[in-house]
Regions:
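C-terminal motif of bacterial Sec signal peptides marking the signal peptidase cleavage site
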Residues: 23-25
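Bacterial N-terminal signal peptides that target proteins for export
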Residues: 2-13
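Short acidic-aromatic linear motifs embedded in glycine-rich loops, typified by GG[WY][YF]DAGD(H)
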Residues: 27-160, 169-177, 184, 191-192, ...
Length: 488
């Protein structure tokens, strides 16, 4: 054993000595950094193409601010809704529902990435996204002074950068209050940021947007859709005026926008008619509100209402960002929490290959397969649409008759195994129900939905309905969700 140990000690020493000799044999220049490329901002942003590249990122971020967080459970837009009177979090299987606002309404409350299924809001996402937008706008403003170009063109770039910065700060101050005001890129690492009063920030943004309104061109004078135009600048300036109490100036800008900028309300149907995912189960009567909210019609010349559009279509490689509105904001009604009086599950998301499939009850394609991360409030469903305490039946934005608005009671049981197959679902049982053994199964007045938070509410279908092109083409698919890869 002793000889065995000595043998391996000798080998180890020899290996160590050999390695040491090899290392000392290398010259110190071997350790000198030799990067193949260097990122030098002064060089990259010294041309118009460099400035264009940053502006393109600003435009894309503006779209991503609401469209997606790369998550199948969460998009940013409903977090804004939850701090209004319109929506509340509704995923009852999560550990929290933003119930402790003092803890959760902070920019650093939840710094996990967007794929964390336990998240209930996008508060940190807004903080990060908005300050990234501020940084990119400041990049343009910091370097454009040394870029050789016509002064008029230079002022257009400055005006668009001002818009992007002002838009982010308009969001930040109303989401978080007093925040740090950054108007240039930091030259050294900095951690001692201090907040600036909200009103001071708003007044600075007003001055910037007054400049932008002068120099940014109208959409009709631009080659591309999706970039900042004069109408968008004027709209943001009017909002900023109102935020500091300058209501007269705000009205002046809005009068110009409405009467002298080529925009007008759409009063008749126009563009392409999308009949919905399944026109038999959920028919749509064509109307101007439905047409106005279709992605196919948003950016066409016939649409006189759009002030600034943000294209989001095609494939992911073309910068398309999925927006699963029908998954995230529609009721989770395809499970056994909603029953018929005989105790059978009321609604199933059958595939078209299933023997129990009936086109007239195909609500999965008509309305999507929701999981209800967020839901509409009672105010949004009812009170908002009342005029003098009476429901306005003529408002197309709340019209169930045209298919624009989804009421749960409009759905019919699509379970062939139920005695109530083809009958409308009800929140409460209308009569006692006895089975074939004369046993009482359901009493009159019993609740037919055991989770009304997540599974029983109305939806503004005309807003959130998106064509799920890829999944719609698959006969075996049972989960339409919204705009997926390849959508318009």
């Amino acid at each position: 054993m002793k000889n065995y140990i000595q043998k391996y000690i000798c080998k180890s020493v020899a290996l160590f000595v050999g390695t040491s000799l090899m290392l000392t044999g290398c010259s110190e220049s071997f350790l000198d950094p030799d990067p193949q490329t260097m990122f030098e901002p002064e060089t990259v942003f010294s041309t118009e193409n460099g400035i264009k590249s940053v502006l393109a990122i600003c435009d894309r971020q503006l779209k991503r601010n609401y469209v997606s967080e790369d998550s199948r459970e969460m998009i940013a837009l409903p977090t804004e809704y939850t701090f209004s009177d319109l929506m509340v979090p509704s995923a009852t299987d999560k550990s929290g529902l933003l119930d402790n606002v003092d803890n959760l309404l902070r920019p650093n409350s939840d710094q996990t990435n967007e794929k964390n299924l336990g998240r209930t809001n996008s508060i940190y996402f807004f903080w990060r996204q908005n300050f990234e937008g501020v940084r990119n706008a400041n990049t343009i403003l910091s370097f454009i002074g040394n870029v050789p170009m016509d002064e008029t063109l230079k002022n257009e770039y400055i005006g668009r950068a001002y818009f992007h910065r002002a838009y982010r700060y308009y969001s930040l101050v109303f989401q978080f209050g007093h925040v740090p005001l950054l108007t240039k890129l930091p030259e050294v690492p900095k951690q001692n940021y201090r907040s600036t009063h909200r009103d001071a920030i708003l007044k600075k943004m007003v001055a910037d947007m007054e400049f932008a309104v002068q120099w940014v061109p109208e959409q009709k004078d631009m080659d591309y859709v999706g970039m900042v135009n004069k109408g968008a600048c004027r709209m943001l300036l009017s909002k900023l005026y109102m935020s500091i109490g300058e209501f007269g100036k705000a009205k002046e800008q809005l009068d110009i926008l409405i009467d002298k900028s080529g925009y007008s309300l759409m009063k008749e149907s126009f563009g392409t008619f999308f009949e919905g995912g399944e026109s038999v189960s959920w028919p749509i009567t064509r109307n101007v509100i439905w047409d106005l909210h279709r992605p196919e019609n948003k950016l066409i010349a016939a649409n006189k209402e759009v002030i600034m559009g943000m294209p989001n279509r095609g494939a992911a490689k073309e910068s398309f960002i999925p927006m699963l509105t029908m998954r995230i904001m529609y009721p989770f009604f395809f499970d056994n929490r909603i029953k018929m009086p005989d105790g059978k599950q009321a609604l199933f998301n059958y595939t078209r290959k299933d023997g129990k499939y009936r086109k007239e009850y195909d609500y999965m394609r008509g309305l999507g397969r929701g999981i209800s991360t967020f839901r509409t409030t009672t105010f949004y469903q009812d009170d908002l649409w009342a005029v003098n305490d009476k429901m306005d039946q003529t408002d197309l934005r709340h019209s169930a008759e045209t298919g624009n608005w989804m009421h749960m009671e409009k759905l019919k049981c699509n379970n062939p195994d139920s005695e109530f197959f083809g009958q409308n679902i009800k929140l409460y049982a209308e009569d006692d129900y006895y089975n074939e053994k004369n046993e009482l199964v359901t009493r009159k007045g019993d609740l037919m939905c055991s989770d009304t938070i997540r599974r029983w509410y109305d939806v503004p279908h005309y807003i959130f309905c998106l064509n799920d092109v890829i999944n719609q083409a698959k006969e075996t698919n049972n989960g339409l969700e919204g705009a997926t890869d390849g959508s318009i």
